[in-house]
Amino acid sequence: MPLTGRKIRVLVVDDSAFMRKVLKDIINSDPELEVCGEARDGIEAIEMVQKCRPDVVTLDVEMPRMNGLDALRVIMKKYPVPVIMISALTQEGAEATIKALEYGAIDFIPKPSSSISINMRELKDEIIAKIKEAAKVPRRFLELRRIRLLRVQKAKKVKPSVPARIAVAIAASTGGPQSLLKIFPKFPENLKAGILLVQHMPPGFTRSFAKRLDSVSKIDVKEAEEGDVVEEGKAYVAPGDYHMEVTLRGGKPVITLNKKPKMHGVRPAADPMMITAAQVFGRRTVGVVMTGMGRDGAQGIVEIKKRGGITIAQDEKTSIIFGMPKAAIETGMVDYVVPLEKIPETVVRAVEMIRGGGNLGRHVTIPR
């Protein structure tokens, strides 16, 4: 039972009666959750938010009369509540979902296009866990976010391809897309490191997210492919349903993708990426663990620190979900605990420290 002693109230919004029933059955099967109402479109959703005062809303992206994005804007502006988007596995669905996360949605659940009831029931544990985590999100994160991200006009000149000698390994989950979109524009074009990013997302969504990150960043961002050489000033996003690892090939750091068993219930997981990055780059590795639920990234932080690298965790105040950073900090192997807005400058300082041959002591906390 939640700390309040009452069940978590959930409003289910979907234009499909069948889909609403599947979601209601899943939610009501957990003793800590209850469905307080349902709606068929965005207009009904706004009315029901006022009537049943839910703790969490599950909101379909594509609906008649008023779609999920438009409803989300109104809900976050007038009746702030944690919202989880239910999105189709299409390019349009993925792009709309990324936009919804920018507007203030906490998380999303992919909606398979066929065998919906079978697939959604396979997702039962994930749906229940995400609803419970969303209900805990501090109110300060519940607002209509207008992230004014200007598309960056990248220089047309061809940049020289320089294999990275330093790696920045970033782990993120719930709350990650919104947070990463805030910090990636701050990385300088001439960053003397390659960035390896694992954001927990299913196939299709990672490609849309990589494109969105690229559009607002000075560095080049792409969804990672098998055999990519890790280069300076470039970021590589692990593709959905593949673990991303790093190996040495011909003296160059190369990305490999695999479908080894899920770790922490997810694929991609950050730990395989961070551990192999540490093995390849050694002390020239910077590890960053950001907002998200679970423990992914903690093992990677330990491995990076053991090999002399520099480790960073996002602080509790700016983490939408503090699970992953907390687990990393509890290893005792984190050098810097910093607010979200300080992560880019801390990474740049760490890269410069490594290039200059310096070494950070452990347990260093950058003050606000």
Curated annotation (Swiss-Prot):
Its EC number is 3.1.1.61, 3.5.1.44. The modification 4-aspartylphosphate is found at D60. Its main location: cytoplasm. Transmembrane segments: none annotated. The active site is at S173, H200, D296. InterPro entries: CheB-like, CheB_C, CheY-like_superfamily, Sig_transdc_resp-reg_Me-estase, Sig_transdc_resp-reg_receiver. GO terms for cellular component: cytoplasm. It catalyses: [protein]-L-glutamate 5-O-methyl ester + H2O = L-glutamyl-[protein] + methanol + H(+); L-glutaminyl-[protein] + H2O = L-glutamyl-[protein] + NH4(+). It is found in: Cytoplasm. Residues 161-354 form the CheB-type methylesterase domain. GO terms for molecular function: phosphorelay response regulator activity; protein-glutamate methylesterase activity; protein-glutamine glutaminase activity. It holds the Pfam family Response_reg. Residues 9-126 form the Response regulatory domain. GO terms for biological process: chemotaxis. Keywords: Chemotaxis, Cytoplasm, Hydrolase, Phosphoprotein. Phosphorylated by CheA. Phosphorylation of the N-terminal regulatory domain activates the methylesterase activity. Involved in chemotaxis. Part of a chemotaxis signal transduction system that modulates chemotaxis in response to various stimuli. Catalyzes the demethylation of specific methylglutamate residues introduced into the chemoreceptors (methyl-accepting chemotaxis proteins or MCP) by CheR. Also mediates the irreversible deamidation of specific glutamine residues to glutamic acid. Contains a C-terminal catalytic domain, and an N-terminal region which modulates catalytic activity. Belongs to the CheB family. HAMAP family: CheB_chemtxs. This is Protein-glutamate methylesterase/protein-glutamine glutaminase. It comes from Pyrococcus abyssi (strain GE5 / Orsay). The gene is cheB.
